[in-house]
Amino acid sequence: MTRRKKIYEGKAKILYEGPEPGTLIQYFKDDTTAFDATKKAVLEGKGVINNRISEYIMTKLNSIGVQNHFIKRLNLREQLIREVEIIPLEVVCRNVAAGSLSKRFGLPEGQALPRSIIEFYLKDDKLHDPMVAEEHITAFNWASTQEIDDMMALTLRVNDFLTGLFSGVGITLVDFKIEFGRIWENDFSRIILADEISPDSCRLWDSQTNEKLDKDRFRRDLGNVIESYTEVARRLGIMKEMPTVIQGGLH
């Protein structure tokens, strides 16, 4: 068995060298963190579920012209992706008041926002991922003005699609976080969607009860994290039941 070259390991995923130039293998871990990784746990099966959900959503987005790094799912925990030059920003789109937005502006959790709000955060755990303005982004050369415009336009397209997708299965898309990267073609680059879209990166509430079906169940010690992630997958028609552990492997 050939040992693969690890390119990068984050809190929830590992990137390995891909089989072809310009490709990577993205491995979904069961590790779960919150509050800048000060709270940690291993939730068996989470990586499998997130791999399937992200595959499903990225494939759907590709089909409507939202280009992203996903190529194909390889197995339960891995997918083949395009290698991109990651922009060091998290782009958050909010539809309903929750999390830090509620705290910053004194908004009751669950209050619908007048319109979708897009925020940018610098990817830096040591600095606690500070929110940044467009002036910071261009001044420090994290992205150009055109790239900011492209990211905002793509984020709104993703929001429109996800809102409809989840609404159709009785889930409210409260907010979500996405990342973007550059693809270079000769001397020109373009922005595409990267990372993942899953209950780790979205706030998802049951439309009838407002029950949380996302990572807030871990953040707030609500329990049943895997069951909630599985429920999202079940409603999307991806997985009919919770994955079971058989001889050390998830099936």
UniProtKB/Swiss-Prot annotation:
Listed GO MF terms: ATP binding; phosphoribosylaminoimidazolesuccinocarboxamide synthase activity
Keywords: ATP-binding, Ligase, Nucleotide-binding, Purine biosynthesis
Gene3D superfamilies: ATP-grasp fold, B domain, Phosphorylase Kinase, domain 1
UniProt record, GO biological process: 'de novo' IMP biosynthetic process; cobalamin biosynthetic process
Catalytic activity as recorded in UniProt: 5-amino-1-(5-phospho-D-ribosyl)imidazole-4-carboxylate + L-aspartate + ATP = (2S)-2-[5-amino-1-(5-phospho-beta-D-ribosyl)imidazole-4-carboxamido]succinate + ADP + phosphate + 2 H(+)
Family label: Belongs to the SAICAR synthetase family.
NCBIfam families according to UniProt: purC (TIGR00081)
PANTHER family, A to Z: MULTIFUNCTIONAL PROTEIN ADE2 (PTHR43599), SI:DKEY-6E2.2 (PTHR43599:SF3)
Protein name listed in UniProt: Phosphoribosylaminoimidazole-succinocarboxamide synthase
Source organism (scientific name): Phenylobacterium zucineum (strain HLK1)
Gene behind this protein: purC
